[in-house]
Amino acid sequence: MKTKITLVLLLAGNLTLFSQVLSYADQAVLFSSEDMLGTARYMGMSGAFGALGNDLTSIEINPAAVAVYNGSEFASSIAYRDSNIKSNFYGNTIDNQDDYFRFSQIGGVSAWDNFGNPDIFKFSVGFNYSVTKDYNNNYIVQGNSGVPEFLEDPFLNYDDDPDNDVFYNNVEDQTFINYTSGINDRFTFSFGTLYKERFYLGASMTFHHINFYQSTEYKEINNDGSGDFLDAYNNQTLSTYGNGFNFGIGTIILPTDNLRVGVSFQSPIWYNLSERFNEYLDIVLSNTNEVYVESYDPNFYDYQLRTPSKLNGSLAYVFGSAGLISFDYMYQNFRNTKLQPSSAFTVENQDLSSSLRNTSTFKVGTEWVFNIITLRGGYRLAQSPYKEAGDSFDLNGYSVGLGIRFSRNFGLDFAYDQSTFDDQYRFLDIPGVDAARLQVTNSRFVSTLLFSF
């Protein structure tokens, strides 16, 4: 039963409550977005790898990258994230800081020489597991909009008795707590070949998994102007989980020995998702001994999601064994995001089409080798998919990296990445009440253990 999608739940009498968990449209955007996660080499160059290859995470951007390998490689990565979310609601600002640690990537590649065909110089296969989105976040919003969500005594019948004129319309405090957890991860299988020494060709199949949990708490204290108080507490929980599939194709072309051009396409991800929605409400009045409580049976609902496809164009120049510079451009058609079955999501799909825009992401990275030490750096800019979002809602990020090659077979890579963007969360759907503003800064440190053989 798709109760949550209506955003309005009639609890009792005249009491109306709005959904505070993410809407289906907002979930669709969230599940279509990715973090900067992967190997430390990839992150150290801000992901500008579409024309380079020779990195396990780059295979997920351009499958032809697997064919660049000349041998076999195994890599595993762990990531630490420091999250700072600064919330502002009607002039009241709260700094919310948390840190998280997780295993983020593991994979391997094997390459073989040609099988007697003079045009096919080698064949490569690869496997990579990676976390694409970390949903762990926690923040508090507190302030006073001056407009109450809970105005009336739930035990009084305002429609049938006109003498019931007690309204708790003086807001003293409004607090919203949002807790999310879970991950979006994927398994990518890729294969590629080098054709006539100038054309790397590749294809991939990727299996995705989503496990998302959200718990929201809303607390409001109001008074009636005569010394009596209403204290309301509302808790909503949402669990969404499921699996998806997509495919990718790509090529890397070498017009000269130093110049590389990459083009790749990632199909939409087709998800089958299931959700569970719970809700609890209690209201305490200071002038009575009664407590109003509503607790609902869980709602379960299954649906499908189609995320945007991705088109990536890349250009890189390699200065022999000394270093390189690389540029990536990615285009995503967010307006084609769809929820299904279409008959059940007419309003949401119209909202996605009208409120979203197709986006561009720009990445630039560089790498320089000094004997066994490699230094890296990068910058990226990712547009917000929301049409009405200002420039501050775009994501800006930079990265630095260090690689140490202890031997031909063993190395360690490290990377630091920081990104910032603005966001908002509308936990009160009341005309004239603003959404909470959020300033989000994520700082990540990643290390990768590398074996070549």
Identify the role of each PLM range.
Residues I61-N62, V433:
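Short structured motifs
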Residues L30-A51:
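N-terminal targeting signals for Sec/Tat export/insertion, comprising classic cleavable signal peptides
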Residues Q20-L37, A111-F453:
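Outer-membrane beta-barrel porins/channels
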Residues L15-S19:
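Sec/Tat signal peptide C-region and signal peptidase I cleavage site
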Residues K4-G13:
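Sec-dependent N-terminal signal peptides
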Residues A40, L52-I61, A67-Y139, G182-D185:
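Outer-membrane beta-barrel translocator/receptor signature
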Residues G50, R81, M330-Q332:
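Short, glycine-/Ser/Thr-/acidic-enriched flexible segments
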